[in-house]
Design a protein with these regions (language model features):
Chain A
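ABC ATPase NBD coupling module
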Residues: 123-139, 168, 240-242, 283-286
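Short coil-to-helix segment of the ABC ATPase nucleotide-binding domain corresponding to the Q-loop/switch region
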Residues: 151-158
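Conserved ABC transporter NBD signature motif
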Residues: 114-122
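Helix-to-loop junction immediately C-terminal to a conserved catalytic motif
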Residues: 106
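Conserved ABC ATPase signature
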Residues: 191-195, 199-201
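Catalytic Walker B motif of ABC-type/P-loop ATPase nucleotide-binding domains
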Residues: 216-219
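Conserved catalytic motifs of ABC-family nucleotide-binding domains
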Residues: 212
Length: 298, 299
């Protein structure tokens, strides 16, 4: 059911995109008054360059701003691209715009200006009706887990498959595998309330990964967890990343970020202040166990 | 779509949210019960009021010397007058028999029949009795009404005006009271159901939010809720009907054999009542849960 629709979207996207690149030169009129023009030297993130769309990037932000109706600035002209199979940290203090990026990516709301593309789809062109189908291609993990309290661990993960119209047989085949991968085989019939925070977050990751999405978003996935449990979750995300999924993690756990040594995008009051693409990356071929040892400082 | 999945989902949800489900069930039961009692009561009251109003008659008294031929002429005249619904003839002899029953000594002492032939005229509407009266009065008050019946053999026409007005006022009051009560009850029931639905949905707002995040379509989320509303409505309605049936068998049926009053006015019979109540319970709770969800689906 889903693939033909997706094909259709892709084709339509491409056609519109061609028509659009000519007209799109900056639609900033609506929110001009929020922009403070003084004492700012233009940096890379400010210039909206019409570069050709990179087919390798899965997330592509161009001059994206988000101003909330309260007057708060969520994001201010952010431009960045995330490549397929990359593991990217989004860091910054509370209110810096990390969550805004995440919420824009799941199309919870529209940007005030700028353009977001995910896997080649311009998000502004996905109609409200199509949002559910779009979201099935994105796994999301939150600080507060967001599990369904009335369902067992198994059923929580199965739900992500059920919404896509998966058959009972598919679910029977898939769910136990995913739960084994996330180390929850023994907790199959427990309800979320009976699990520890770390276990609940594992269920959330398992659910996010159930459809094998090309992109996984994690908003403060370790925010409520102790350091050792956090390492376990990061290992899990790393394993998923190694399986080919692009992972975008928003966090303020600078310790963890420093140890993981992956690409870091730093936000401050909605502005991108650092994009460490050239930073010294940690080894990308280490095993999950090796990563765990490194994070524990062994 | 997969109805089996949705049915299982709604059953699971009812089981896992036992307390809100029970609250919804109880409110549907109570509302259905109240309406189920109220429909026949309103009908009976209206029937009774109308029966009382139907007794507003205009009596046309003939001269005591009137012959059968005079009576026949008068009868046709009266029947042709506007606003007259029906005419009942009470002959001298019948009147005497009736009155003698009430007061046998007096009539025996009298020794002859002082009563005239009488026509009991029923106006087509209780409020029209004054018009009928005017038409049947010969030149009543010096200003003859157009089309008035002029028959020299009619001695007098009467309806006790004060009595009629009293009856009309009282029955109108009863009808208005019942209407106000019915409106109040319906509003109260609707508020009760709306509140229950909103409460149980509010507790699941987060659940809906999570479902949307995982990529569930609106109808994928909505179907189990709608089915749940349908089941709860059906169960609550059925329970209310069982209670009503028990009440009818034990209370009403035994009463009606004792007091003829209860059974007299035409009320809705039990089967249509059941169908109406069931349809109301199910549709209100199904639509209610389906529609109230809409607000939470906006994410």
């Amino acid at each position: 059911m889903a693939p033909p629709e997706n094909d259709l979207i892709v084709r339509r996207e491409r056609e519109r995109e061609l028509a659009r690149t000519r007209t799109h030169t900056g639609s900033s009129g609506t929110s001009r008054r929020f922009v403070r023009e003084s004492h700012r030297t233009p940096d890379a993130s400010e210039r909206v360059v019409e570069r050709p769309f990179d087919p390798n990037s899965i997330v592509d932000f161009r001059g994206v701003s988000k101003h909330y109706s309260s007057g708060d600035v969520g994001l201010e002209r952010a431009t960045f691209a995330v490549h397929r199979q990359e593991f990217v940290f989004l860091v910054g203090s509370t209110g810096s715009g990390k969550s805004t990026v995440m919420r824009l990516l799941i199309k919870e709301f529209e940007p005030s200006e700028g353009r977001i593309r995910v896997a080649g789809h311009d998000l502004s062109e996905i109609s409200r009706k199509k949002i559910p189908y779009y979201r099935r291609n994105i796994g999301v993990v939150f600080q507060d887990f967001k599990l369904l309290p009335n369902r067992t661990v198994h059923d929580n993960v199965a739900y992500a498959l059920q919404v896509t119209g998966a058959s009972r047989r598919q679910i029977r085949n898939t769910v136990p595998d995913i739960l084994r991968l996330t180390g929850l085989s023994t907790k199959l019939h427990n309800y979320p309330g009976q699990l520890s925070g770390g276990e609940q977050q594992r269920v959330a990751v398992a659910r996010a990964f159930a459809n094998h999405p090309p992109l996984l978003l994690a908003d403060e996935p370790t925010g409520n967890l102790d350091p050792e449990t956090s390492i376990g979750i990061m290992q899990l995300l790393y394993r998923i990343n190694r399986a080919g999924t692009t992972v975008l993690v928003a966090t303020h756990d600078s310790d963890m970020v420093n140890k993981m040594r992956r690409r870091v995008i730093e936000l401050k009051r909605g502005r991108m202040v650092r994009d460490e693409t050239a930073g010294s990356y940690g080894p990308t071929d280490e095993t999950t166990a090796e990563l765990g040892d490194r994070l524990r400082g062994l | 779509m997969r109805p089996g999945f949705f049915v299982r989902e709604s059953l699971r949800s009812m089981r896992r949210n036992a307390v809100p489900s029970f609250a919804a069930l109880a409110s549907i039961l109570v509302t259905t019960l109240v309406i189920g009692v109220f429909i026949p009561v309103v009908q009976a009251t209206n029937g009774a009021a109308n029966a009382v109003r139907g007794r507003v008659l205009v009596d046309v008294f003939m001269n005591t010397s009137a012959t059968a031929a005079n009576d026949a002429t008068a009868r046709t005249d009266i029947l042709h007058a506007p606003h007259v619904k029906s005419v009942q003839f009470v002959s001298k002899a019948q009147a005497l028999a009736q009155q003698s029953k009430l007061n046998p000594q007096a009539y025996q002492a009298l020794g002859y029949n002082p009563l005239p032939d009488t026509f009991r005229v029923t106006p087509d509407a209780p409020g029209d009795s004054q018009l009928v009266l005017a038409e049947l009065t010969q030149g009543g008050g010096g200003t003859p009404v157009a089309g008035a019946v002029h028959d020299s053999m009619i001695a007098s026409v009467s309806n006790s005006q004060s009595e009629t007005n009293k009856i009309l006022t009282v029955t109108r009051l009863v009808k208005i009271t019942m209407a106000v009560l019915a409106i109040l009850l319906i509003v109260a029931s609707m508020l009760l159901i709306a509140n229950t639905i909103r409460l149980s949905l509010f507790s699941r707002r987060r659940e809906v939010e999570v479902m949307k995040l995982v990529g569930a379509t609106d109808w994928f989320i909505r179907w189990p809720f709608v089915l749940e509303g349908l089941f709860l409505g059906a169960i609550g309605g059925a329970a209310a009907i069982v209670v009503l049936a028990v009440a009818k068998l034990t209370v009403i049926n035994s009463l009606s054999s004792t007091f003829s009053l209860v059974a007299h006015s035409a009320t809705i019979s039990f089967i249509p009542l059941i169908i109406i109540l069931m349809a109301c319970a199910i549709s209100v709770s199904t639509l209610g849960s389906g529609l109230s969800l809409r607000r939470f689906l906006r994410v």
